[in-house]
Amino acid sequence: MFGRILAVSIQQAARSVALTLFPASFISLFAWATAGSQSGNTTDPIRASVWIWLGAHLIPFHLNIAASHLPGALTLLPMGALIFPIWAIRKSFPKVKDALPKIEGARFFFALAYTLIATILALISTSSGIKPIWYLVPLFTFPISYIATYDFKAAENRYLRFAFHTLIFFWGAAAIALGLSLAAHWSVLHDLGVVIAPGIIGGLLFLLIQILYIPNAAFVGLAYLLGIGFKLGSGTSVSATTFTVHGIPAIPIFAALPTGRHPLLQFGLIGLFLLVLIMLLPIIRENSLFKSRQFFALRTALLAIIIVTVIAYLSSGELLTSELQIVGVTWWRVSAFFAAASSAVLLFTVYIPGLIKRVRARG
């Protein structure tokens, strides 16, 4: 029985990998055939396809940039690319679930097999210039492959689901603001595109990468609109009251950057409190008893803080060089702001009303 479960888990995990690795191989081979490579080694596109696949799981890389011979890293990876492995996992997992009646066991064995394959791919794809950080692969692929198998439509998840949908709504509003900012800075966007001059095929691939980076940029934009701010490399700061930028990389999506200070956005902190309040609104409305309201509100708030912290961490990172070591939000700063807002909302919606009821009951 155990052998059959393990075999099915490995088989379906390999199927999930193949569903996304083969398209990545096609893209890599097509790019190699049109642009070529300096070494002319046919293993380059094969390794590159694995790097694309690992990058879709947000696995960070160590880099040795040949032009400068300086070590660097790529930890700022496109969050939008997660949709591909999640789709592949959800496509393959049902057969594992059929083989193992206990759903949690099925999730564990599937995620374990998926993580093992990903770690092996990271090890065999290492080159002198690009090295996937293989020991971090389990920290990324196991949670992704495990969580992707969940059905969040269950009734017990409805409060968390509503909170997550609220966050998505605010995130989407920030994406709209990002688009408006790109339209307002069209000349800068055009100039950055001209500087890169990737050609037709390269331009299409570069456009795809920019689209996949939209969730990162939108989350950074949300942090800016809510008064938290972000960074664009070492020694920089962009917020409502500060604007210290030494230059911008030649990447079109950076054309959406603000051009100066906007002190009125300090009031965006009110939006942060509003976000948390809306997240907890169904709990406040449906639970009049203090204990039930406290339980559901605390659980939802804590899980929301964890989710926001993870998103903040994944949406930012180092972009190739040490000068761009911090591009995006500072994850612990976002977490601290969100935790403070959650504490204030819990105080005014759960604990103070509960205290008032207790005082009235004694009186």
Segments from the language model and where they lie:
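Long, glycine/tryptophan/cysteine-rich extracytoplasmic
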Residues: 2-83, 199-269, 313-336
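Transmembrane alpha-helical segments in integral membrane proteins
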Residues: 8-11, 69-98, 217-224, 265-288, ...
